[in-house]
C-alpha cells in the first residue's frame, strides 16, 4: 500500500521541512491547498449562510491526487460541522475511496463562557448538542455521560456525528490524552467546553 502525507498550512509545511513527520520517507504531496483570503476560521461569520459560503471557499483540492485514495484528514475541532461536512463531500466528489476524520480535541459540548472561541450564541449551535437532542429528546440530558469517552452514550454520539458528516470513520482525542500530552493535572486545565468543568475541578 502506498501512503502520502499532505497539508495546507505553514505549520505543516514547516514540520515537513524539519523532518518531524517524514521519518518513514512518506512522500509529501499537495492534494489540498488552503485559500487564505477568506475568514481565518470558517465558524466565525455570524450567519449560517456566510459560514457555509466561507467553508466552500477555504480549500482547493487536487482531484488527481485524491482519486481512488483512502484518506485520513485531521482537524482541530468540530463546532457546527459546517466546514467539515462540506469538505468531506468535496473529497468524495474528487474520487476519494474512503475518508477518515481524526479530531485533536474531544467533542465540544459547551460553548466557551470565557473566550467564546466558537462564536456561538447558544449551546444549541453546537452540532453535538443537536445530536444529543435527537438521541435523548433533550439537549441537556445526560451530558456527563456524553462527555465520558468510556460510555455507550459517547459512542452513540460519535456514531451520529460520523453519519451526519458522512465519513467512513470518526475519532476524537480524549481529555486524558490531552492532559497527558500537556503534562499538567486536570484541575489546572480548563476543560469546560468538553465536560462543563473549569479550573480547579478534577
Task: Report the location of each language-model feature.
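PRPP-associated nucleotide enzymes
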Residues: 1-202
